[in-house]
Regions:
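Glycine-rich (often Gly-Gly/Gly-Pro-rich) flexible segments and glycine-rich loop motifs
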Residues: 1-6, 14
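Surface-exposed cleft-lining segments at the edges of enzyme active sites
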Residues: 42-45
């Protein structure tokens, strides 16, 4: 998070200083810890860490015999990326009247963020067989597992936006946010795909 809270309530877009004060953030943090035993996380000097990813690839080629050849290939790709809370949207589709939950108007606590985790594992096997000069066969089988999920830091807690009256005296704008990111709990895509193809070639 590039935005930092202010000491005097004066924001600066150039210096990434929010109007949200350290005193207010500290007051809310202490209240949540004492009243609900909930730690909302840091409110400054936190942010997106570097994306973490790895790839594992392995392949085996086996000449079973002169007429039968087997290939097995395995791929495993995993990536993880830290993200700040969604900038302005709410479950009801209402948009906050500011530049986001981390902006010149507002600061969100660290535990409002989420981790996007994606893992794809697949295994493929191919068996090529020659039964006679005129008959051959290719058997293909594959299995793919896709796990695309979100994880949140901290304990589960209702997401809260603290609003305040804007400078125009008519509309409310975000000032502070804490709790579990509203679109991340139990949000995930799990897919398992299995394919088998058998091709027989007969020469005339």
């Amino acid at each position: 998070n590039q935005w930092q809270p202010s000491t005097d309530g004066v924001g600066s877009a150039e210096n990434k200083i929010s109007q949200t004060t350290i005193a207010d953030l500290e007051r809310v943090s202490n209240f949540l810890k004492e009243k609900y035993n909930y730690d909302p996380g840091a409110y400054q000097n936190f942010g997106n860490s570097a994306a973490d990813n790895y790839k594992i690839m392995a392949r085996i080629d086996w000449n079973i015999s002169k007429n039968h050849k087997l290939m097995v290939r395995y791929n495993d790709v995993k990536s993880q990326d830290d993200n700040l809370v969604s900038g302005a949207s709410t479950p009801g589709g209402v948009r906050l009247n500011n530049a986001g939950r981390n902006s010149i108007n507002s600061i969100s606590f660290a535990n409002t963020g989420y981790k996007q985790e994606n893992r794809v594992r697949s295994i493929t096997a191919e068996l090529n067989s020659v039964f006679s000069p005129k008959v051959s066969n290719k058997l293909l089988a594959s299995f793919t597992n896709i796990n695309d999920t979100r994880k949140t830091d901290g304990d589960l807690f209702p997401f809260v936006d603290i609003m305040r009256l804007g400078s125009d005296g008519k509309t409310y704008e975000g000032y502070m946010s804490f709790g579990t990111e509203i679109f991340s709990f139990n949000n995930g895509v799990l897919n398992n795909t299995f394919n088998i193809t058998d091709n027989v070639t007969i020469g005339l």
